[in-house]
């Protein structure tokens, strides 16, 4: 029963979903959207490598025409004095690093850099690298400083300076545009004092901006490099022209700046001409044609009154018909591009590939239980929500939004509701959904697996039960081991006594057996002896000895007396 006077069923906006893969290259965005996979962002893939260095000369004081009459611009003198005091520590730090590098051998040069860093109180690897860069760039900075006079004389905002060593630099006059448009024509007019005040106010604002941008460099130039974002502030509108003219690339200037890959380092300051030489490190960029890095957002989906969450990578690389997982951990991610030094993609399984291509029967889902889950996502002005797990209401027009039992998620655009309420959260819908979504999807029971570290109810209970049983067995084993240790001496004595008793028993039994055998043998011998005596006596009776007829017996010899 509907609770509002304006009931609506989103199933009228849907058609049946086929699980066949979508035609064309790339992932099946329409099919995946029905099971809770939403594409939130697509970016181009850029590769970059360490490039060469360029140099920028920043004029800390604009070129001014000579004032007419006896007009004395005291504001410029005060500005120069303040700026010199401000930059003196920076110049001393640079001199400390560079002067310690005057030794001839390479080993001494490196030792000089370390000594210079020790004098500045820094010692990290990044700071050593920055200091070495300052030393290496000092020769180029010296060549650039020799051209300071020619730089001072020009009135152009950007001018190319080429020394005898073909060192290329770009001379920037940060506030020259203001001078050209406001001050240059005004100095020839009357009222020098008002012009002096106007120049002073501009220079004071510029000085405030200067101290804010170069604060870290003023403390220690080898501590942190100057970011291109800070450099753009001080260079103003001239920086895009520099980037586009000097560093030929198809990338947008804002994209380059937001990447943070363009860095600057102060390498020299000329106090006489009030000029600062900055070394700019510009990487080499190459775009991978046809490659897209896609961010995927997952929400829970409904499957026959069961809440499940699909298992897909949060970021993928889509190139032609190839799909890879892409973490981009070592890459720089900007709003429109991903800058990497190498391809960070990793292969995926065949089942996951088929799933991303639109074969939903190959997808793996995890059953989830809990209250604070990803049940909705807002992308491109359209709301994707699992209304089987959340209370979905529309405030404009007022109604309850229902979700069919066979539908995975609900898609809400401006044609359905202009303001949607998800439990206690309110969202404004601003865009029209231009994709047809299905009302249901089929899923094999084997495709539901417990994978992610969510609240998995029964599975978690089984794991806890197994752990408790294992802990109980371990406790029993420990108790038995303790008892065995305490009874070790008793068990040893008892074992020895038992062994002696067994040996004695064996010896006794052996002696008895030997005695019995000897007795039997003696009895047999006695019996055999008796039989032999009886036999001989009987034989003598039956066979008496023969009569003796010898001569002696017939004629006895007379005895002599």
Curated annotation (Swiss-Prot):
Protein name: Fusion glycoprotein F0
Gene Ontology terms: biological process: fusion of virus membrane with host plasma membrane; symbiont entry into host cell
Transmembrane segments: 496-516
Side Cytoplasmic, residues: 517-561
Assembly mode: Homotrimer of disulfide-linked F1-F2.
Site (Cleavage): 109-110
Family: Belongs to the paramyxoviruses fusion glycoprotein family.
Function: Class I viral fusion protein. Under the current model, the protein has at least 3 conformational states: pre-fusion native state, pre-hairpin intermediate state, and post-fusion hairpin state. During viral and plasma cell membrane fusion, the heptad repeat (HR) regions assume a trimer-of-hairpins structure, positioning the fusion peptide in close proximity to the C-terminal region of the ectodomain. The formation of this structure appears to drive apposition and subsequent fusion of viral and plasma cell membranes.
Region of interest called Fusion peptide, as start-end residue ranges on this chain: 110-134
Keyword flag Kinase: no
Superkingdom, natural source: Viruses
Family annotation (Gene3D superfamilies): 1.10.287.2480, 6.10.10.110, Head and neck region of the ectodomain of NDV fusion glycoprotein, Newcastle disease virus like domain
Subcellular location: Virion membrane; Host cell membrane
Record lineage: Viruses, Riboviria, Orthornavirae, Negarnaviricota, Haploviricotina
GO cellular component terms attached to this protein's record: host cell plasma membrane; membrane; viral envelope; virion membrane
Record organism: Simian virus 41 (SV41)
UniProt KW keywords: Cleavage on pair of basic residues, Coiled coil, Disulfide bond, Fusion of virus membrane with host cell membrane, Fusion of virus membrane with host membrane, Glycoprotein, Host cell membrane, Host membrane, Membrane, Signal, Transmembrane, Transmembrane helix, Viral envelope protein, Viral penetration into host cytoplasm, Virion, Virus entry into host cell
Modification after translation, per record: The inactive precursor F0 is glycosylated and proteolytically cleaved into F1 and F2 to be functionally active. The cleavage is mediated by cellular proteases during the transport and maturation of the polypeptide.
Position of the signal peptide: 1-26
Topology class, membrane: Single-pass type I membrane protein; Single-pass membrane protein
Glycosylation sites: 72, 80, 359, 434, 440, 464
SUPFAM superfamilies xref list: Head and neck region of the ectodomain of NDV fusion glycoprotein (SSF69922), Virus ectodomain (SSF58069)
Coiled coil: 135-163, 459-484
